[in-house]
Swiss-Prot record:
One cellular component term from this protein's GO annotations in UniProt: cytosolic large ribosomal subunit
Protein name per UniProt: Large ribosomal subunit protein uL18
UniProt-listed GO biological process terms: ribosomal large subunit assembly; translation
Purpose of the protein: This is one of the proteins that bind and probably mediate the attachment of the 5S RNA into the large ribosomal subunit, where it forms part of the central protuberance.
Sorted UniProt keywords: Ribonucleoprotein, Ribosomal protein, RNA-binding, rRNA-binding
InterPro entries: Rbsml_uL18_euk
Claim: Ribosomal protein is one of the keywords in the record: yes
Zinc as UniProt keyword: no
Subunit structure: Part of the 50S ribosomal subunit. Contacts the 5S and 23S rRNAs.
A GO MF label: structural constituent of ribosome
CDD domains per UniProt: Ribosomal_L18_L5e
Listed Pfam families: Ribosomal_L5e (PF17144)
Length: 199
């Protein structure tokens, strides 16, 4: 047993910090900066983006985008949490933010680790390409991955080597009527639809 945990000076961390949901130091920095935040959260199924303004009574949501919208509103047939979906969700959120008068934000990636290739950076890249200013530095974006070319190449290789595994791994794509090898062209189609919609 850890004796320090029972000592008189032991301080229990806030519940959301214990649950791995909130970094209160980062939260404090955002609050005192008074800057609009571009909040990115990625779950096992979806990509969620919110543009929020700090307010003493609680955050004020200015705009948001959810990757589930890609399928419902724009006909996206791929996964809702892969790299292309992350970029598209960020792009959609960026357009909506600009539409509501937001031109610049700071990135809030929560407890996501800012490692090379992390999908949160593809979300941010999407918003930047939509016209939103987000100071982020070098985020090591690979343009091929934005369109899902890495997925298409893997699918093509797997299809020739193990058709059963191909059908299993890409069952959702196939059920929706998309051959994963065609993901890059499908990505371009959906991106154009988002651009045409204006957010």
């Amino acid at each position: 047993m850890n004796k320090l945990a029972n000592g008189p000076n032991y301080k229990v961390k806030p519940r959301r910090r214990r649950e791995g949901k909130t970094n209160y130091y980062k939260r404090y920095v955002y609050v005192i900066s008074k800057q609009t935040r571009f909040i990115v959260r990625i779950t096992n199924k979806y990509v969620i983006v919110q543009i929020a303004k700090i307010d003493p009574k609680g955050d004020i949501m200015i705009a948001s985008a959810h990757s589930a919208e890609l399928a419902k509103k724009f006909g996206w047939k791929g996964d809702e949490n892969n790299t292309p979906a992350a970029y598209l969700t960020g792009y959609l959120a960026g357009l909506r933010a600009i539409k509501r008068g937001v031109t610049e934000c700071v990135a809030d990636i929560g407890l996501h680790v800012p490692s090379k290739g992390n999908r949160v950076f593809y979300v941010i890249k999407g918003a930047i390409d939509a016209g939103l200013k987000i100071p982020i530095g070098d985020i090591s974006i690979e343009n091929d991955r934005i369109k899902g070319e890495h997925i298409a190449k893997y699918a093509e290789k797997l299809k020739s080597e193990n058709s059963d595994l191909y059908s299993k791994l890409f069952s959702r794509y196939l059920q929706r009527g998309l051959n994963p090898e065609n993901l890059p062209s499908h990505f371009e189609e959906i991106l154009n639809k988002i651009k045409s919609s204006g957010g």
